[in-house]
Amino acid sequence: MPKTDIARRVYNHTWKLDPIIRSLLDTDFYKLLMLQMIWQLYPDVDATFSLINRTKTVRLADEIDEQELRDQLDHARGLRFTKKEMIWLAGNSFYGRKQIFAPEFLVWLAKFRLPPYELSRRDGQFELTFRGRWAETTMWEIPALAIINELRSRAAMKGLGPFTLDVLYARAKARMWLKVEQLREHPNLRISDFGTRRRHSFLWQRWCVEALKEGIGPSFTGSSNVLLAMDNDLEAVGTNAHELPMVAAALARNDRELAAAPYKVLQDWNQLYGGNLLIVLPDAFGTAAFLRDAPDWVADWTGFRPDSAPPIEGGEKIIAWWKKMGRDPREKLLIFSDGLDVDTIVKTYCHFEGRVRMSFGWGTNLTNDFAGCAPTEINGLNPISVVCKVSEANGHPAVKLSDNPRKATGDPGEVERYLRFFGSEDFVEQSVRV
C-alpha cells in the first residue's frame, strides 16, 4: 500500500467532502460479532444510543461545525458493504474458525445501511441520538465516535500551515516510535490496536497499525478495526461489550431477571461462539457483584477483560476468583484495555508475567497522542472521553455502573437503583481522561 503524506493530505482542502468513514468495515470487530447475536436472538428489540461527552470542559458544539458533522453522518448513511468486503467476511478465518458468520446473516448484512440520526445542540454540546431496532442502531456507535473525534482534530488543525503540520506529524511519529522501542524490550508481550473510536484520524490509525506491524512483528496480534485488519492482512480482534448486559438488564421484568442478566447474555454468546471468543467483560454493574454471583461455568471461559478497575488491582481480583473456583490462572487469559499507554502496559505485564496469559488492547493513547506535538499548544488536539452508549431498550432506561463511578452512565435515578441492587463493593473513583 503506498504511503500517505498525512500532513500534506490534511493541508489540502480542495475537495468538497473528505469522508471520515469510508467503509462500514471501518468499525470494531466485536460490533459485527455482537450484531450477529442481536440479529439472531433479539430481532424485535429497540435500542437507543446516545452520545455522551464526559469531558464537560470541552464544548464540542463550539469546536465542531454542525453542518460538517451532518455531512459526515449523511455520508456514512449512504455506505453499504461492498462485494469484496462480503466475500472477505464470508471466507476469512476469525479466531481460528471458518464461516463464523452464518450465510443468512451475511445476506441480511449485504443490504444493511445505518439508520437515521437525531442531532441538536444544548449548552455547547451536541445531542446525537440513534433510535430504532437494536440490530441497526448498534452499528452507529463506532462511526459516530470516529466522526466526532476526527472533526475535532480537523477543526484544531484548520489554521495550520504545511510546515507546521509537518512538524506536528513528525513529532507524533517520533513519539509513537519511542513507544514501539519500549515494547521491543518485551518480545513475549502481546498487544493489539483498540484505537478506532477515539482516534485522531483514520489515516493516523492506519499509520500506527502499519508501524506496529513492522516495529514489533509477532508481538502485534491484530487490530479491532475490521477494515484495517482486512487491508493489512492482520487478525481482526475483539469479543463483546457492555451493551449486551446493559440491554438485558433494561429488559428485565423483575429482580430475578435483573440479577440473571449479566450471565444470560454470556449464555447467548456461547450459543454462537466458543474458544478464544469466550471472554468475560465483568464490570457493567461492578466486577465484585459479577464475581459474587457468577455460576461455576463462567470460570471455564477462556478469560476476562477487566475494563475499568486499575489493571493490576483488577487482574489480581480475577486471579483470586479463579483460584477460589478451583481453576489454574496460568491456563487463563486476561485482556487489559482501559486507558492504557506503554508504561502501564509494561508495568502490568511484568507484574503478572508467568502467572496468567495476557494480552493488551491499546486504544486512545496509541491512535490519539498528539498533546504537545504542535509548535504551539492546541487544546483541540488533546483526547477527550466521549462515548456512545445504550440509553434505552424497548423504552426502558439502560445503565452502566463500571468499577469507576465516574464512568457510570444512565438516568441518575436508575443508576441509584442499580447501585442499591448490585452494590458498590470495591468501586474505585479515578479520573477519566479517555
Swiss-Prot record:
GO terms for cellular component: cytosol. It is an enzyme of class 6 (ligase). GO terms for biological process: NAD biosynthetic process via the salvage pathway. Its EC number is 6.3.4.21. Transiently phosphorylated on a His residue during the reaction cycle. Phosphorylation strongly increases the affinity for substrates and increases the rate of nicotinate D-ribonucleotide production. Dephosphorylation regenerates the low-affinity form of the enzyme, leading to product release. It comes from the Bacteria. Pfam families: NAPRTase, NAPRTase_N. GO terms for molecular function: nicotinate phosphoribosyltransferase activity. It catalyses: nicotinate + 5-phospho-alpha-D-ribose 1-diphosphate + ATP + H2O = nicotinate beta-D-ribonucleotide + ADP + phosphate + diphosphate. HAMAP family: NAPRTase. Catalyzes the synthesis of beta-nicotinate D-ribonucleotide from nicotinate and 5-phospho-D-ribose 1-phosphate at the expense of ATP. This is Nicotinate phosphoribosyltransferase. It comes from Sinorhizobium medicae (strain WSM419) (Ensifer medicae). The lineage of its organism: Bacteria, Pseudomonadati, Pseudomonadota, Alphaproteobacteria, Hyphomicrobiales. The gene is pncB.
